[in-house]
Regions:
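Charged docking surfaces used in two-component/phosphorelay signaling
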Residues: 14-22
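Short hydrophobic/Thr-rich beta-strand motif most characteristic of the beta2 strand and flanking loop
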Residues: 24-31, 39
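Active-site beta3 strand of CheY-like receiver
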Residues: 44-50
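Receiver (REC) domain active-site loop signature in two-component systems and cognate sites
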Residues: 55
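Short, glycine/charged-rich "phosphate-handling" switch motifs in NTP-dependent
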Residues: 99
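C-terminal output helix
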Residues: 106-115
Length: 124
């Protein structure tokens, strides 16, 4: 399996990337939504995107909306990983097409459990 970690924080990209790599998932990185869309085009086999909400240029919600507007990306699972904790934010992300929602800070165990719910763990 191949995934992208989309977050403007290099530290967060490294943390999530390390967890995914431990699960046998190949990872590419992007620092904002526009760069994330470029990576999707450059890496057509991506099956999962872990996406932050608050990023410069194009935020995570806008990224999810752009991805879901293109039917070619229907199989891509989009997991919002963010500090946004309000129920309204959660619903906006899910309504836009997020497959799952993970609130920061998170533990490795929570992240793996969320990925298991999407049948990602063990797929690699």
């Amino acid at each position: 399996m191949r995934a992208m970690v989309l977050d403007d924080s290099r530290t967060v990209r490294l943390i999530i990337g390390k967890i995914l790599a431990e699960l046998g998932i190949d990872v590419v990185e992007a620092g904002n939504g526009r760069e994330g869309l470029e990576r999707l085009r450059e890496h057509p086999g991506l099956e999962l995107v872990m996406v932050d909400w608050n990023m410069p240029e194009m935020n995570g919600l806008e990224f999810i909306q752009a991805v879901r507007a293109d039917r070619a990306y229907d199989p891509v699972r989009l997991v919002m990983v963010t500090t946004e904790t309000e129920q309204e934010q959660v619903m906006r992300a899910l309504d836009a097409g997020a497959s799952e929602y993970v609130m920061k800070p998170f533990t490795k165990e929570i992240l793996i459990a969320k990925l298991s719910m999407l049948d990602i763990v063990g797929e690699s």
